[in-house]
Amino acid sequence: MIISRQLPSFCLAALFLSFSGGAHALAQPEQTRAEIRRTSFGVPHIRADDERGLGYGIGYAYAQDNLCLMANEVLTVNAQRSQYFGAEGQTLEQRDNLSSDLFFSWLNTPQAVAAFWQAQTPAMRERMQGYVEGYNRQLAERQVQGLPEQCRGDWVRPLATSDLVKLTRRLLVEGGAGQFAEALAGATPPGATAQAGLPAEHWQLAAARQQRFALDRGSNAVAIGSERSFNGRGLLLANPHFPWVGGMRFYQMHLTIPGQLDVMGAALPGLPLINIGFNQHLAWTHTVDASKHFTLYRLQLDPKDPTRYLLDGRSLPLERQTLTVQSKGPDGQLQPRTRTLYSSVFGPIVQWPGELDWDHQYAYSLRDANLDNSRVLAQWYAMNQASSVAGLQDSVHQLQGIPWVNTLAVDDQGRALYMNQSVVPNVTQAKLAQCSDPRAGTRVIVLDGSRSACAWDIDPAAAQPGIFAASQLPQLARNDYLQHSNDSAWMVNPAAPLQGFSPVISEQDVPLKMRARFALDRLSRMHKAQVSDLQHLVTDDQVYLAGQVMPDLLQFCEQDLGADAQRLGPVCASLKAWDRSAGLQAGLGFVHFQGIMQPLLQDPSVWRVAFDPKDPQHTPRGLAIGRPAVARALRESMLASAQQVAEAGLGSDVRWGDIQQVSQGGQPTPVPGGPESLGVYNAIQSVPAADGKREVVSGTSYLNVVSFDEQGPRALGLLAFSLSSDPASAHFRDQTAAFARNQWSVLPFTEAQIRADGQYQLQVIEEPRKGAVLARQ
């Protein structure tokens, strides 16, 4: 047991004197105190008597495990990357520092940050204040001991509450404006030479990152109700797919205020509450939804001046905002980098070469619904305390603070619920017909910016102007099952299709993702679902697409391959030997299956049975190898895969676990799973690395199954990328190794379970309560 009551006086002095701009602390009689109980894999169970103390423990524990990660993200959201690392450097998301800084200068203005802070409840302000104090205490202690190698620069500093606000606002716009940072920072009027555009390679990276958004932030979820669970109580699988590095990396923890709060699960960096988890009576999870959280507006420009636009026949000037960031030059000196950003009444101008061009006729404005969402923290605060599915649903209806995810939940009474209840622009089907550009389709909504009538509708019942009211959004309560894998709301349960919504909310009669078809197939055969049944959805690593196309692939292999027989023979042999899984022992056939099918999936004409909206669970399927064009495309894809495997130096005896690994910062650890497009429920995204290897970048993250009995929740789970991002930590890869072994652990929730854990350790932190750490401007 470790007891830590008081920082040395010199640490406290360094801690509080380091705040800028007159930040100060006034001693008060009470103490700020938290208990941090660590169990297996270092998971912190944080207990305090009040909100300030709970936040204090969260911030301290998080800094113990992820201090450098947090310091890096704080630098990013404060638009200071160029100042310390130069404009041409890159973020972890491969965004150039200058674009990142300009974007966050626009997003996190002092006015926006102050307004968000003022909108928070007193309880949430107390918890955020405590988080800052706890993080800063751990930072001061680590500075005395020596900071980790990754963050020993002068860019590492204490937190202020404004930093937590900025981190939260960054998370809010991940489903919208956050995907357009380069487009916002690089928007330039035609003919202007005052500010240079971005290099072509920056746009290529931005496009690739935008296309990967849904893959990096996907998810699976299954909620089983009383009719189909083994004991008549709720049963939930949470399987969010999120990045393994950076500001979207989940953190596992348990939060307790005796008599008031007892909740366990995972949270994103800087959030002092649980995003996905369970309490005594309720378990819930989220999946990234298919709803739109922003729209574009095509502006009709004034023919006389491309910095003016026509609205209802009137010529209006674009608003100009000058942003300046400091950039470190090759000589180490700081130089100001200035850009002018332009905005219409709808939002900032964005420019994407070849897609959203700013010429003398048109420009495009972006409007993100979550920019006005100051309810997000209050929303998860209420969800953490809900004691039933009905209570959870009521809180979401009232607050409407969920930014861009669906919610699936169960409770101990056997109720199951699905809600597509996020912040969605109020653009009805009728308004789309009147105002949208049909050439854009529904992937991105482009509205007519020349008419004020095309602005988002206002519903007095909604929590903020311009979004749909909760009553207009999809939701479904069932006693059998509900599932979701990032499709629309349409087929969460085929027995009760959710239909008739604006395409901005949810589409119908569109193909399901292979993961959803896999889940629906399994669920149709689960009559009394056990905990192990939900675990096996993930751990079996089944490649669902293989069952749909392998008979045709093998039939093609049995045909006369002509002059290509020598090159394609080994490909066909590996496919035949493959076990149709993405497990660590999967052979070379899985590598070839990926190489063959991923290009073919881009062409809907390859299917032998086309998609049928009346049978979405079973179509499309099969490969139309009898059609010459499809046979030719298949042959070319097989030859290309053979060439890629040869160039990578992969032998016939290679296993998937030899190829797909996580290696950054430590010894390589094999990782099971594969591309979601192939129907791998255990979705893992990896990118090519050296020597034919693949490095994991995102996918299965926090993973659990929660059931209930008379005593409360029973949870099994793990954090696939492990608790700490510090390579020196004992908890840097420990859960990743368990993930590779399909070894889930009991998540200790009760006091008895916590104290009985073989790795139990207690730390108490305590210090005199201070006044507010003033927000930096």
Curated annotation (Swiss-Prot):
Other known facts: AHL-mediated signaling mediates quorum sensing in many species of Proteobacteria, regulating hundreds of genes, including many that code for extracellular virulence factors.
Protein purpose: Catalyzes the deacylation of acyl-homoserine lactone (AHL or acyl-HSL), releasing homoserine lactone (HSL) and the corresponding fatty acid. Possesses a specificity for the degradation of long-chain acyl-HSLs (side chains of 11 to 14 carbons in length).
Compartments, as annotated in UniProt: Periplasm
GO terms, molecular function: hydrolase activity, acting on carbon-nitrogen (but not peptide) bonds, in linear amides
Family designation: Belongs to the peptidase S45 family.
One GO cellular component term noted in the UniProt record for this chain: periplasmic space
CDD domains from the UniProt entry: Ntn_CA
Gene3D superfamilies to which the protein is assigned, alphabetical: 1.10.1400.10, 2.30.120.10, Glutamine Phosphoribosylpyrophosphate, subunit 1, domain 1 (3.60.20.10), Penicillin Amidohydrolase, domain 1 (1.10.439.10)
Name of the protein this chain belongs to: Acyl-homoserine lactone acylase PvdQ
Active site: 219
Catalytic activity reported: an N-acyl-L-homoserine lactone + H2O = L-homoserine lactone + a carboxylate
Signal peptide: 1-25
Propeptide segments, given as residue ranges: 196-218
Originating organism: Pseudomonas fluorescens (strain ATCC BAA-477 / NRRL B-23932 / Pf-5)
GO biological process per UniProt: antibiotic biosynthetic process; quorum sensing
InterPro entries, per database record: Ntn_hydrolases_N, Penicillin_amidase_A-knob, Penicillin_amidase_dom1, Penicillin_amidase_N_B-knob, S45
Assembly and oligomerization: Heterodimer of an alpha subunit and a beta subunit processed from the same precursor.
